Structure formats: C-alpha cells, structure tokens
Design a protein with these regions (language model features):
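Single-stranded nucleic acid-binding surfaces, predominantly the OB-fold ssDNA-binding core
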Residues: 1-90
Length: 90
C-alpha cells in the first residue's frame, strides 16, 4: 500500500539533531501540509536525515509526498503516539 498526500506547505519546523539509543546520529524536521479542498485536511509529517537536511521548500509551496505510519509508546507503555514519516518528496 502506498500512502500519498498532496497539499500546500503551511508550517516548517526547526531542524533537530539527536543521537539514538544505539548511538546513531539523526536529523529530524516536521512539516505541516494542508489540502485545498472545500473541507481542508491538515497533516504533520516528520522528515528524517537527508530529507530533513536537504528540505528547501517555502511556505505556500505545493508538495506531494509518500509516507509510512509509525507508532511508539510513551515511557509507561500505556499510550501510543502515531507519526507520519515521509520517505519521498515530489
């Protein structure tokens, strides 16, 4: 299954750098896209590593991307948080 989303860029988050538990260095950035429909849909996507570092779009640009779903538990393991992680920008 291919998950695609096309929308207008409405927010560009700051680039964040961190080290994972297994010692890998990661770069992450969040972007928010909104559709131009009668009832607009808005979604926040996470860009990682090369996508985050090479992101050169501006607010208002139309972007099409492909993404995967990821879920991670909180520290207590009592609640899960979903993440939409982009893996290709068009």
């Amino acid at each position: 299954m291919t998950n695609e989303f096309t929308g207008r860029l409405v927010h560009i988050g700051a680039t964040e750098q961190f080290d994972t538990r297994d010692g890998r260095h990661m770069v992450s950035r969040e972007i928010v896209l909104a559709t131009d429909e009668q009832f607009p849909k808005t979604a926040c996507f996470t860009l990682r590593n090369e996508l985050a570092q090479n992101f050169s779009h501006n607010i208002g640009d139309s972007i099409s991307l492909r993404y995967d779903f990821h879920a991670r538990p909180n520290k207590e393991g009592t609640r899960y948080y979903n993440e939409l992680r982009a893996w290709r920008l068009n």
